[in-house]
């Protein structure tokens, strides 16, 4: 798989920014079929950094409704990537 097919988008939240500042860990939404090795390789190729560790979580869908219409959000996979000391991803800086 191409790195841009594996990494869907960065997760922008208060918790993810705390992880960046305190732990040097970056959070991404990734393809549900991707494993940790593929995610590691994709992040290293896309951002030119060295990845030390990858943790993944399957985020379950939640029920939602709008008026009488009921539905569910999509199930997605989240990857928390820890980088080597001194490495940073500029995409997250200054937001």
UniProtKB/Swiss-Prot annotation:
For this protein, the record's Pfam families field holds: Ribosomal_L23
Q: Which UniProt keywords apply?
A: Ribonucleoprotein, Ribosomal protein, RNA-binding, rRNA-binding
In the UniProt record, the gene name given for this protein reads rplW
Superkingdom per UniProt: Bacteria
List, alphabetically, the HAMAP family matched.
Ribosomal_uL23_B
Classification via InterPro entries: Nucleotide-bd_a/b_plait_sf, Ribosomal_uL23-like, Ribosomal_uL23/eL15/eS24_sf, Ribosomal_uL23_CS
Q: What does this protein do?
A: One of the early assembly proteins it binds 23S rRNA. One of the proteins that surrounds the polypeptide exit tunnel on the outside of the ribosome. Forms the main docking site for trigger factor binding to the ribosome.
**Per the similarity annotation, which family is this?**
Belongs to the universal ribosomal protein uL23 family.
Keyword rRNA-binding assigned to the entry: answer is yes
Q: Which GO terms describe its biological process?
A: translation
Instruction: Please describe the quaternary structure of this protein.
Output: Part of the 50S ribosomal subunit. Contacts protein L29, and trigger factor when it is bound to the ribosome.
Classification via SUPFAM superfamilies: Ribosomal proteins S24e, L23 and L15e
Q: What is this protein called?
A: Large ribosomal subunit protein uL23
**One GO CC annotation, please?**
ribonucleoprotein complex
The molecular function terms of the Gene Ontology recorded here are: rRNA binding; structural constituent of ribosome
